[in-house]
Amino acid sequence: MRTGIIAQKIGMTSVFNDKGERIPLTLVKVDDCQVVGHKTLEKHGYNALVIGIKDKKISRVTKPMKQVFANAKISPKTKLKEFRISEGNFIDIAANLEVDHFMAGQFVDITATTIGKGFAGSMKRHNFRGLEASHGVSISHRSHGSTGQRQDPGKVFKGKKMAGHMGCNQVTIQNLKIFAVDRERKLIMIRGSIPGHKNSYLSIKDAVKKNSITV
């Protein structure tokens, strides 16, 4: 198991294949992605690499993190993330990770944070049908309806689907296929859509369920 990388979502576009079929693509950019540190089985109980992306002003870094970057002899990074690895897949600290870490036709898993939607009702958040439009229903047309039973149990169970904050959740989309890799522009083109708004950070790693490469 090798390390993944951190990338930044640029936006979406599309191309047409020889059959005239439209293929939606998401563009992600890998810029200034470096190895910041190691986590070893002897010292930390597991093997992992700490990866950082995009240079950050030194004035915006805390003193403890300044020492971390100083030990690695690299400039401070905006985003850090750990990736679990197997024993023989360590990469030197301060090494650069480029877009050619992956190749066209490869399947990857992408972890990102969904776009926040704020406070949302049950119909938008959970796809409830709502109540009737007439026949005794007034004011509560978009309500979720009953939320419990009676005096016993006398409470609303945890996890009940109700209105509340929607979005801003970390999700992983599996088995997305890499359409192309542009080393000159530092871009990876991925088929389909991925979570998150433009310029948000996401992590890309080898697919757990699909490791074969198809062109």
UniProtKB/Swiss-Prot annotation:
Post-translational modification, as annotated: Methylated by PrmB.
SUPFAM superfamilies found in the cross-reference section: Translation proteins
Ranges annotated as spanning the membrane: none
GO function terms (MF aspect): rRNA binding; structural constituent of ribosome
Alphabetical keyword list: Methylation, Ribonucleoprotein, Ribosomal protein, RNA-binding, rRNA-binding
Gene Ontology biological process terms in this record: translation
Pfam families assigned: Ribosomal_L3
GO cellular component: ribonucleoprotein complex; ribosome
Annotated segments matching region Disordered: 136-161
Residues recorded as bearing N5-methylglutamine in the entry: 151
Family: Belongs to the universal ribosomal protein uL3 family.
PANTHER family: 50S RIBOSOMAL PROTEIN L3, LARGE RIBOSOMAL SUBUNIT PROTEIN UL3C
Complexes and interactors: Part of the 50S ribosomal subunit. Forms a cluster with proteins L14 and L19.
Cited function: One of the primary rRNA binding proteins, it binds directly near the 3'-end of the 23S rRNA, where it nucleates assembly of the 50S subunit.
Protein name: Large ribosomal subunit protein uL3
Species per Swiss-Prot/TrEMBL record: Rickettsia akari (strain Hartford)
